[in-house]
């Protein structure tokens, strides 16, 4: 008897499903891509329990003929290609004929479809790949596919599913990418009756970007365009001031297909040159039109890996297109715009509206534990607050209760002093936390301050000789120990905001933040859902300075998105490192004598005044002996050759 047998088709489909259908988002991707290939202009995706209970995709495409519907459940049955040569001219998103049979083999599958010229529609019901019903029905032109109880017959796969929030986040990401790839299609994603994503389908890519990432982000995107004999590159990239902490916001499309390609990611970063800060990445949507003969999409069943001929030439074209577009832009952030933002909420951000722009010396305010350009700023704040009147907006009484006024938070460009901090990334933060936990309090010499150099280094003398102090590293250490103590010191001491802040995030980020909201709450930050893809902040811990709120909350959420499973203790420590680095005195800022002496005093009170949180030295010491050697006032001890017994 032969040992080798041909597997039953249903079993073969279940095996294939292991590669094609990894999770609910894989089902959504395959079904929506089929709808796009069918010429749909409107696609609605409805899911329940993150797709594990129900996934329903409805489109207004061309539909499937009655006699072809059962064939759609047969493996390698497709309308996209007919002969070998077609493999080299693929312009559709699907072509392998594996998705539908793979999905049907691991779910309870229902399809209703009708064509424009058909006499009636078609209803087909299958369970585990076995067709149970196939009959005519009344149905509008287009296709509706409903998937129920995904993986009901492969329980081992269910065990490896993540939380519903995580799976939903993957689905939202898939729809976002497809929306960017096909702005001409109107997408609607509904989860458990709640609308998550909606795009207009106008064909305008910038509008699609605004629908996904928000209007403020879309305004800071720059159009790019370039072409040669083989490639056409178009799309949008963010200004250097608008960055994110990872590459997740880079979308690369080839002939309308979202792909992942490390070298093309590298080309995008190369286009920015030195304009990007270390550890920061742009937002980008790059659409590449290419002769299908130069791109092999038949590499993996998911079709996200594509092999490209002339890849180096394409990389150069992308880099040049981005560099050329950025060169035409005014890359200096609009100071007037920032000042206008600060005046929207005068009663709560007075120090930003009162800065004397002609002076560059910093003064330390002991009460507020911070530096200002002018010592009178802290005093002016009181009279300013008394005279300022909050701005109130008219509200509809019938509408949902809203605060009298809100401020939409924007991500401000991070300071370029981060170029000095290549260690400001997740891996180095974790290493720094481990080292900091082992620190012990040490003694510190009494220092007498007497000068500053280049607005960066402080000079002081003590019994040990001359000390040179890096003022940024020094305050970074001071701030770190302040934040380390305060972050997570959650009590009833919350400061109510006169004008609450609104923070906007993409839908998939919203889901992940909600999933890990407990970490933020344990750090003293309480965000409430407010409208579509928005959080509102109504109060903040007293230790959190109000002028730090916009950047601080976005930074805390960015870190939340980057961090894997972590304890609240470690999350607080990493936040303390990041916030101390970004909020310390920058280089090239002169300090008055009082502020410099106060900084040295604060440094002396630190548990470890010798290193910044990243481990870099805060100060170096030249002893009197070292100085005398440098000026050759004393000589090194020498032993003569005769004394060594050579002669």
Curated annotation (Swiss-Prot):
Keywords: DNA damage, DNA repair
Positions with biased composition (Basic and acidic residues): 390-400, 408-423
Region (Disordered) location: 390-423
Family: Belongs to the DNA mismatch repair MutL/HexB family.
NCBIfam families according to UniProt: mutl (TIGR00585), PRK00095.1-3 (NF000950)
Pfam families: DNA_mis_repair, HATPase_c_3, MutL_C
Function text: This protein is involved in the repair of mismatches in DNA. It is required for dam-dependent methyl-directed DNA mismatch repair. May act as a 'molecular matchmaker', a protein that promotes the formation of a stable complex between two or more DNA-binding proteins in an ATP-dependent manner without itself being part of a final effector complex.
Matches recorded under HAMAP family: DNA_mis_repair (MF_00149)
GO molecular function: ATP binding; ATP hydrolysis activity; ATP-dependent DNA damage sensor activity; mismatched DNA binding
Biological source species: Streptococcus gordonii (strain Challis / ATCC 35105 / BCRC 15272 / CH1 / DL1 / V288)
UniProt GO cellular component terms: mismatch repair complex
GO biological process, one term: mismatch repair
Record-given protein name: DNA mismatch repair protein MutL
CDD domains: HATPase_MutL-MLH-PMS-like, MutL_Trans
């Amino acid at each position: 008897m032969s040992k080798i047998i041909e597997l039953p088709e249903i079993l073969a489909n279940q095996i294939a499903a292991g590669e094609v259908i990894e999770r609910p988002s894989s089902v959504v991707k395959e079904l929506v891509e089929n709808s796009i290939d069918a010429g749909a202009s409107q696609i609605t995706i409805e899911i329940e329990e993150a797709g594990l209970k129900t996934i329903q995709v409805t489109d207004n495409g061309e539909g499937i003929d009655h006699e072809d519907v059962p064939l759609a459940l047969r493996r390698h049955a497709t309308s996209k290609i007919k002969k070998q040569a077609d493999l080299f001219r693929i312009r559709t998103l699907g072509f392998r004929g594996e998705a539908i049979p793979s999905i049907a083999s691991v779910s309870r599958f229902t399809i209703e479809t009708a064509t424009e010229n058909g006499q009636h529609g078609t209803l087909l019901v299958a369970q585990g790949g076995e067709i149970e019903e196939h009959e005519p029905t009344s149905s509008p032109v287009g296709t509706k596919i409903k998937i129920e109880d995904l993986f009901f017959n492969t329980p081992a796969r269910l065990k490896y599913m993540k939380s519903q929030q995580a799976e939903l986040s993957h689905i939202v990401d898939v729809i976002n990418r497809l929306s960017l790839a096909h702005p001409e299609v109107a997408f609607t994603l509904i989860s458990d009756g709640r609308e998550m994503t909606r795009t207009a389908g106008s064909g305008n890519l910038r509008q699609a970007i605004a629908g996904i990432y928000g209007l403020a982000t879309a305004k800071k995107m720059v159009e790019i365009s370039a072409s040669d004999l083989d490639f056409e590159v178009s799309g949008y990239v963010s200004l250097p001031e608008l960055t994110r902490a990872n590459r997740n916001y880079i979308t690369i499309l080839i002939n309308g297909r979202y792909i992942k390609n490390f070298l093309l990611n590298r080309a995008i970063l190369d286009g920015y040159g030195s304009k990007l800060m270390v550890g920061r990445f742009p937002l980008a949507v790059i659409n590449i039109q290419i002769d299908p003969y130069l791109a092999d999409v038949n590499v993996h069943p998911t079709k996200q890996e594509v092999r490209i001929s002339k890849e180096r030439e394409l990389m150069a074209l992308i880099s040049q297109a981005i560099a050329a577009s950025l060169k035409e832009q005014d890359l200096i952030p609009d100071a007037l715009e920032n000042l206008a933002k600060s005046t929207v909420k005068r009663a709560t951000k007075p120090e930003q509206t009162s800065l004397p722009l002609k002076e560059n010396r910093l003064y330390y305010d002991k009460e507020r534990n911070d530096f200002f350009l002018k010592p009178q700023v802290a005093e002016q704040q009181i009279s300013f607050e008394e005279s300022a009147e909050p701005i109130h907006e008219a509200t509809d009484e019938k509408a949902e209760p809203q605060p009298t006024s809100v401020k939409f938070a924007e991500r401000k460009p991070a300071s370029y002093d981060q170029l000095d901090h290549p260690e400001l990334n997740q891996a180095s933060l974790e290493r720094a936390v481990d080292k900091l936990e082992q620190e012990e309090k040490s003694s510190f010499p009494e220092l007498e301050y007497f000068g500053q150099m280049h607005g960066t280094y402080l000079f002081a003398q003590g019994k040990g000789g001359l000390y040179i102090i890096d003022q940024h590293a020094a305050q970074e250490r001071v701030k770190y120990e302040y934040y380390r103590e305060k972050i997570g010191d959650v009590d009833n001491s919350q400061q109510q905001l006169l004008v609450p802040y609104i923070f906007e995030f993409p839908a998939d980020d919203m889901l992940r933040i909600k999933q890990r909201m407990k970490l933020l709450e344990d750090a003293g930050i309480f965000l409430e859902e407010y409208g579509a893809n928005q959080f509102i902040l109504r109060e903040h811990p007293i230790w959190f300075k109000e002028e730090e709120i916009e950047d601080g909350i976005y930074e805390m959420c960015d870190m939340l998105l980057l961090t894997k499973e972590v304890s609240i203790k470690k999350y607080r420590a990493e936040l303390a490192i990041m916030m101390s680095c970004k909020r310390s005195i920058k280089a090239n800022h002169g300090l008055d004598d009082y502020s410099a002496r106060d900084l040295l005093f604060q440094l002396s009170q630190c548990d470890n005044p010798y290193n910044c949180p990243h481990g870099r030295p805060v100060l170096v010491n030249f002893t009197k002996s070292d100085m005398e050697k440098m000026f050759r006032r004393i000589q090194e001890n020498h032993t003569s050759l005769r004394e060594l017994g050579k002669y």
